[in-house]
Amino acid sequence: MTEKRLAQISVVLSTIIIMTYAFLSSYFLNKPLNLSSADLMYFALSNLLSLSLPFVCAWFPYLFVRPAAVTGSALSAFGLFLFFAITSSTMDDPKGAAAIWVIYFFWLIGAALAGVYPALFKPHFFTKTATRALVLSALFTVVVSFIIGFLISRIA
């Protein structure tokens, strides 16, 4: 399997799972509230945008580096999504669960900003091999983006 094909598969499968989670959670969490169809659809679309847009922003800058970097960033961003989805679903407090998704949003916006450095400057340590690109993009998505997201949340 080629490097590009692996990147495409990881991005498509992760996006499909995130979209499915967004629509199913929107429907089943609001069904007892007896919302109208228009309100339910509005909530589902806003939920979809708030979950999938940061995910896309996290791996998009790595398109300009190498496909293995896209794979590493997409899989680590998807791992973060799974962690936050499981954490928010096990919380009893709805405000706490909402705060978890705000942290997810800031973390992946930080990942998008962290991905700008390798995309613009294409450092040699990042582009030398596919394995390095995969591991470093995953580390940038998890560690560096946490620092940037934390700083953004403190400023905002």
Swiss-Prot record:
The chain crosses the membrane at residues 7-29, 42-64, 69-88, 98-120, 133-155. Its main location: membrane. Keywords: Cell membrane, Membrane, Transmembrane, Transmembrane helix. The keyword Transmembrane applies. GO terms for cellular component: plasma membrane. It is found in: Cell membrane. It is a multi-pass membrane protein. The keyword Hydrolase does not apply. It comes from the Bacteria. This is Uncharacterized protein PM1189. It comes from Pasteurella multocida (strain Pm70).
